[in-house]
From Swiss-Prot:
This is Periplasmic nitrate reductase. It comes from Cereibacter sphaeroides (strain ATCC 17023 / DSM 158 / JCM 6121 / CCUG 31486 / LMG 2827 / NBRC 12203 / NCIMB 8253 / ATH 2.4.1.) (Rhodobacter sphaeroides). Catalytic subunit of the periplasmic nitrate reductase complex NapAB. Receives electrons from NapB and catalyzes the reduction of nitrate to nitrite. Binds 1 [4Fe-4S] cluster. Binds 1 molybdenum-bis(molybdopterin guanine dinucleotide) (Mo-bis-MGD) cofactor per subunit. Pfam families: Molybdop_Fe4S4, Molybdopterin, Molydop_binding. It catalyses: 2 Fe(II)-[cytochrome] + nitrate + 2 H(+) = 2 Fe(III)-[cytochrome] + nitrite + H2O. Residues 1-29 form the signal peptide. It is found in: Periplasm. GO terms for molecular function: 4 iron, 4 sulfur cluster binding; electron transfer activity; iron ion binding; molybdenum ion binding; molybdopterin cofactor binding; nitrate reductase (cytochrome) activity.
Length: 831
């Protein structure tokens, strides 16, 4: 409906009253920007499409098109602010080259691996796709099919994909691109606390006395949260900010303690801080004795490379990289005592005075500390260790699970938490922190999903890098990519990724809204609906689940990923994909389609299409005859309710600006594990890390170990990759926004001016960035936002014309299997 002036006055009055009472504010009760003209625009709430901050926006539609967006003034996360990408959200869906019909490689009228792309109908696309999947399943079985998903999937899209892969095709070869960004954080949360995701929330920004950024350029990558941090720093004189990075960036402008360290040496710095806390007598012994256990981690664990690589062959602890051996405080203290101030300074290249200043922020018992990190920590061959080490500091001092004391892992995708982690679309996970290797967890999933006992596979599937290797080696032959641009985002793409996509044994499907590098390497491209062209839900970094309605129609024949997954499932019967022993034991399932078993199962289809808000369209409900988003969400929510992952009823989320789980009796949780905030902590317990059977968190002792590859005489520079403010990930959306394209049209190589001069190069010189794996051409930048130390260069990865991941190394953390995009050796040569 369109807002009239009377509607607007009533809505704003309601908003004022609700805000005064501390109540959630409805989506209608919003100030409307733009004057009288805006009153002819229909406004609805949604979370932003970009990063994991989870900003709320108001989306304005008119005549079936998104015509404007503005920051949602009632959203707690951003309070009406947008970053530059959020400001241009209304343009991301309207690039001239939107995909509007399926495209199949064809020659002489039939599918051919070496054919040219030609438009086909959805029926023809699914016919060929199903035939290829059935061929592979029949010839090689479930381990030869795979899927690569996304932290940009909506919650129900990821959930439907997990059901189709695990229960339908009986394959755990399902992984999200969040493997490249959040796996180390998730793994360390589980190992330390027994549950995933931060215990704190964004309210910590208004309560902390110190902020320490570890490998996080928040000023560009999380600018809205940076604005909250900046406000706290500038309005309270006692607040301090420390920023640690391998080069100087915009977040350094606010730093009281700016620290530039050698790549990979943050591990030594972290152990030094732990030693400083212990040696100066600032351990909170009461907290440590009551709430923690100590362990030692396996060492010399390798670098996640192919088994035949010399570094893997030499690694003595690679066979059990995640092993943890119980120990005591004294043994832990002895380990970190080796990391004296002098040794940490020598390893890291940081001035001792700065390290001591940093350590005091954590050691001071009267100072509340919020640690913040993202890719610099997680994209690290010892990323799990780095995450553990920062938890060590908070646990040793008791600075955790209360306002202002918060180790906080930031996320880069809008639902890396809500979908990849909470739904469990990793190769080893099920919903609500359950895992495929646990027979009780599998049985629980089979019960909720109404499946025959013993159906779900017990083996851990291939992770992201391993999927590329298995495609390369012909071990995965049917592969579906949704909502990611893996051919641009994966490491070492020339040697590992591209050969797998073009392997003649393999059939590659890509679902996307725009042509991408990945799509150009596929055999079948399916046009996808974007953002508010479908009803959706995301979960952000502070455990906030946020819904939106479908507001416009997708162009042409583009369809949501949810529709694609559900519709494709109709092409298979249980007799074609399940083993005979399962069907013999459960004959009632014979002859049923996977759609009937997984989606028309009396649970997902129990809500009629008439439940859809009559003011909004729902393409999937109209086609399937029931409300699949509601059914999938309520079925999924059953995994977590009563188990510390409680979600509110489906309809509640359409009325509020998101709620932070666990949501118990209508109340969200801001700080987990702490009495008075968390309903799962009983009166008198004070604090309990209830993810662990004994309620205790783990303090892990591990050493500094060097990166997989370092500069040498031939390859004399460290290469760091990452993002810039104006573009998001591979640029497939932001490069199609004219204003963002003009602001930063192409990638450059940031270099120290003295390094350039010593090679006879200048700002703007065309150069080759060369590694042992590949090379690109780009131009030098010796000024501007990123100021490099000698011997380090930075190249962003958003530019498809400069595929910097031809150069990167496919080393990954042996525990989390997250890729290290921050450290490899390159040489720079003039063209």
């Amino acid at each position: 409906m369109t807002l009239t002036r009377r509607d607007l006055i009533k809505a704003q009055a309601a908003a004022t009253a609700a805000a005064a009472a501390g109540l959630p504010v409805s989506a209608l009760a919003q100030p409307v920007t733009g004057g009288a003209e805006a009153l002819r625009i229909r406004w609805s709430k949604a979370p932003c499409r970009f990063c994991g901050t989870g900003c709320g926006v108001m989306v304005g539609t008119r005549d079936g098109q998104v015509v404007a967006t503005h920051g949602d003034t009632q959203a707690e996360v951003n309070r009406g602010l947008n970053c530059v990408k959020g400001y241009f959200l209304s343009k991301i869906m309207y690039g001239e080259d939107r995909l509007t019909t399926p495209l199949l490689r064809m020659k002489d009228g039939v599918y051919h691996k070496e054919g040219e792309f030609a438009p086909v109908s959805w029926d023809e696309a699914f016919d060929v796709m199903a035939a290829q999947a059935k061929r592979v399943l029949k010839e090689k079985g479930p381990k030869a099919v795979g899927m690569f998903g996304s932290g940009q999937w909506t919650i129900w899209e990821g959930y439907a994909a997990s059901k189709l892969m695990r229960a339908g095709f009986r394959s755990n070869n399902l992984d999200p691109n969040a493997r490249h960004c959040m796996a180390s954080a998730a793994t360390a949360f589980m190992r330390t606390f027994g549950m995933d995701e931060p215990m704190g929330c964004y309210d910590d920004f208004e309560a902390a006395d110190a902020f320490v950024l570890w490998g996080s350029n928040m000023a560009e990558m999380h600018p809205i949260l940076w604005s909250r941090l900046t406000d706290r720093r500038l309005s309270h004189e006692h607040v301090r900010v420390a920023v640690l990075s391998t080069f100087t960036h915009r977040s350094m402008d606010l730093a009281d303690t700016p620290i530039i360290f050698r790549p990979g040496t943050d591990l030594a710095i972290l152990n030094y801080i732990a030693h400083h806390i212990i040696s100066t007598g600032r351990v909170n012994r009461d907290f440590v004795d009551r709430h923690t256990n100590f362990a030692l981690g396996a060492t010399d664990i390798g670098y996640g490379l192919r088994p035949e690589h010399q570094l893997q062959l030499a690694a003595k602890g690679a066979a059990d990289a995640g092993a943890m051996t119980p120990t005591d405080f004294e043994t832990f203290a002895a380990l970190v005592s080796e990391y004296t101030l002098e040794k940490a300074a020598e390893i890291s290249g940081v001035e001792p005075a700065l390290l001591e200043e940093l350590a005091e922020l954590y050691a001071d018992p009267d100072r509340k500390v919020m640690s913040l990190w993202t890719m610099g920590f997680n994209q690290h061959v010892r990323g799990v260790w780095a995450n553990h080490m920062v938890y060590n500091l908070h646990l040793l001092t008791g600075k955790i699970s209360e306002p202002g004391n918060s180790p906080f892992s930031l996320t880069g995708q809008p639902s890396a938490c809500g979908t990849a982690r909470e739904v469990g679309t990793f190769a080893h996970r099920l919903p609500a922190d359950m895992v495929v290797t646990n027979p009780e967890h599998r049985a629980h999933a089979e019960e909720i999903w109404k499946l025959p006992a013993g159906l779900l596979p017990d083996w851990v599937g291939a992770h992201a890098v391993e999927q590329d290797r298995k495609l390369h080696d012909g071990e995965i032959n049917f592969y579906w990519v949704q909502v990611n641009n893996n051919m641009q985002a994966a490491p070492n793409i020339d040697q590992e990724t591209y050969p797998g996509y073009r392997n003649p044994e393999n059939f590659i499907v890509v679902s996307d809204a725009y042509p991408t590098v990945t799509g150009r390497c596929a055999d079948l491209v399916l046009p996808a609906a974007m953002w508010v062209e479908k009803e959706g839900a995301y979960g952000n970094a502070e455990r906030r689940t946020h819904f939106w309605h479908q507001l416009v129609e997708a162009p042409g024949e583009a369809r949501s990923d949810l529709w694609q997954l559900m519709e494709f499932s109709k092409r298979f019967t249980t007799d074609e994909v399940w083993p005979e022993e399962i069907l013999s034991a459960a004959p009632a399932y014979r002859g049923k389609t996977l759609f009937e078993v997984l989606f028309a199962n009396g649970s997902v289809d129990r809500f009629p299409a008439s439940d859809v808000n009559p003011d909004h369209a729902n393409h999937e409900a109209a086609l399937f005859g029931f409300y699949p988003q509601k059914g999938l969400f309520e079925e999924y929510a059953a995994f977590g309710r009563g188990h510390g992952h409680d979600l509110a009823p489906f309809d509640t989320y359409h009325e509020v600006r998101g709620l932070r789980w666990p949501v118990v009796e209508g109340e969200e949780t801001r700080w987990r594990y702490r009495e008075g905030f968390d309903p799962y902590v009983k009166p008198g317990e004070g604090l309990r890390f209830y993810g662990k059977p004994d309620g205790r968190a783990v303090i892990l002792g591990v050493p500094y170990e060097p990166p997989a590859e370092s500069p040498d005489e031939e390859f004399g520079f460290w290469l760091v990759t990452g993002r810039v403010l104006e573009h998001w990930h591979s640029g497939s959306m932001t490069l199609r926004v004219p204003e963002l394209y003009k602001a930063f049209p192409g990638a450059v190589c940031f270099m120290h001016p003295e390094d350039a001069r010593s090679r006879g190069l200048n700002r703007g010189s065309e150069v080759r960035v060369i590694s042992r794996r590949g090379e690109i051409r780009t131009r030098l930048e010796t000024r501007g936002r990123n100021r490099m130390p000698r011997g380090v260069v930075f190249v962003p990865w958003f530019d498809a014309s400069q595929l910097i991941n031809k150069v990167t190394l496919d080393a990954n953390d042996p525990i989390s299997r997250q890729t290290d995009f921050k450290k490899c050796a390159v040489k720079i040569e003039a063209v």
